[in-house]
Regions:
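Long, terminal "pre-/pro-" and other extracytoplasmic accessory regions
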Residues: 20-193
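Bacterial N-terminal signal peptides that target proteins for export
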Residues: 1-8
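Bacterial N-terminal signal peptides
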Residues: 10-18
Length: 193
């Protein structure tokens, strides 16, 4: 009896471990990986993290970690990750955007809510109940009250589920997970306002 229980427990733990290993890395997981691709002057000096619009789920798998870098003109070094693998390191010029400043560096020690949890919090907003949420775009920046996640969401259209609609965004404190601002428009999906 104990052997059977041990085998079952081992199988469950093995499955859980393999599922965790297959999970996409979160935005915060990628900061440490990104540190390997930037100079000493930029390590842990993140001014922004942003994702591309997710594909096939609410969790994005293409991320851009933007570091403050005083040694180059735009004052940033950007490391791009696709499915957890570094694919590009550069110093992008952003038209109509001023160079980064040291006061834009996000205080990473204040962050307790990672990108996956921010997406869950945004998706659980009461206005979105009943919608088939499909995609997200997630950004982390320094806000007025500390680090903030901005989660933009897309839903399947009610009238034509093959099409999607931008249903707005939610700003979430990365320190405590509280909703700072909700700018949702469920009517864009054909639901109720």
């Amino acid at each position: 009896m104990q052997i059977k229980q041990g085998i079952i427990l081992g199988a469950v733990l093995g499955l859980a471990t393999s599922r965790m290993a297959l999970a996409e890395p979160t935005a915060l997981d990628l900061i440490k990986r990104g540190d390997d691709y930037v100079g000493v002057q930029s390590k842990d000096k993140v001014v922004q993290i942003y994702s591309d619009k997710s594909v096939a789920s609410l969790q994005p798998n293409i991320w851009h970690i933007v570091y403050f870098d005083s040694s180059v003109f735009p004052k940033i070094t950007e490391v791009k990750f696709e499915a957890g693998q570094e694919t590009d390191v550069g110093h992008p010029m952003r038209p109509f955007t001023l160079p980064a400043k040291p006061d834009q560096i996000v205080d990473l020690s204040k962050i307790t809510v990672d990108s996956d949890r921010a997406a869950q919090i945004a998706a659980s907003q009461p206005l979105l109940k009943g919608l088939n949420l499909r995609y997200s775009r997630i950004t982390l920046e320094k806000g007025d009250s500390g680090p903030e996640w901005k989660v933009q969401l897309w839903s399947a259209k009610v009238s034509d589920p093959t099409k999607d609609a931008d249903v707005g965004d939610v700003r979430i404190s990365a320190a405590d997970g509280s909703v700072i601002q909700s700018n949702l428009h469920p009517g864009n999906a054909g639901g109720t306002e």
